[in-house]
Amino acid sequence: MEMQLGAMLYVYKGEYGLPSIDFECLRALCLLRFTRCPMDVQTSSNPLRSGAGKLPYLQIGNQKFAGYRQIKRVLDLEGYPIDAHLSTKQKHLSTAYANWVFTNLHAYYHYFLFGEPHNFDTTTRGLYAKRTPFPFNFYYPSSYQREACDVVQVMAGFDVNDKLDKHEGDYLVVNAKKVVNLLSRKLGRKVWFFGDTYSEFDAIVYSYLAIIFKIALPNNPLQNHIKGCQNLVNFINRITKDIFRIEGYSSVKLTKTPSGTEASLTASERKFLDSELNTKIVAGVGAVLAMGAFAAWRGIYNQLTTRSSTDYDGIDYEDDEMEEGLD
């Protein structure tokens, strides 16, 4: 396989200046850009074509490699290992730190983006729906919500489907703040966590913190805490602006960094946001019509065919194996 010939990485398009809205996509992008791998990136993507029902995926010719682990394995084999410049000791430290960050930030990320009802309904659902083709965009984001339910149940011990007063969000916030404090101390005044060279650990930290810090969620206690750690803010902004200056995207330009509770918008931007309700109503009517037409077609088709039906009747999402740590 030649990485230069026809290789393409498919990811969700970004927002709020980020190159992608999704953690897995963002750290896959870090693999490419940190190592300067000569590969094109496609953001107008259909997750259903990945073979796993999700993004990211890498395609080389007719071969597809879905998910971060497979993508990293291909890049390692092709001569673009992200930790090549680290010493053996640093590699072990990187793995240990990554496991600790994963343990304490993964549940926070899933809960506050997908499990917290108001955040999901007002922000996250729309971000993923707009990046998924019609008519799948009306129910595809819910697959991430179901995955978040499993993650939170295993890692935090409560069910996001319970009443809101039973959600132990404070527990997630306390642990996440401890992680941010340690990361800030570990980074200090360095450019990267291990000095002058990037690592997979930098990619993991950036991917978590950039999304949590940049995406304007109504309820996001960690956002202001990150804002108080100026070296981490500089870390996020430097990578976003310098390394992802081409992929970074914003559909609505904010006049200041989102604070999680308010953002200063121009008159035209407010008009854009006010139109969202009308857009959702029209889209909902379209979804009903599309589903009705599909149901009618299925009925006619089943009457005309005698073979047993194994037709597409929804999306089976193959859940990624829960990682015990970030390799």
UniProtKB/Swiss-Prot annotation:
GO terms for biological process: mitochondrion organization; protein insertion into mitochondrial outer membrane. GO terms for cellular component: cytoplasm; mitochondrial outer membrane; SAM complex. It comes from the Eukaryota. It is found in: Mitochondrion outer membrane. The keyword Protein biosynthesis does not apply. Associates with the mitochondrial contact site and cristae organizing system (MICOS) complex (also known as MINOS or MitOS complex). Belongs to the metaxin family. This is Metaxin-1 homolog. The lineage of its organism: Eukaryota, Metazoa, Ecdysozoa, Arthropoda, Hexapoda.
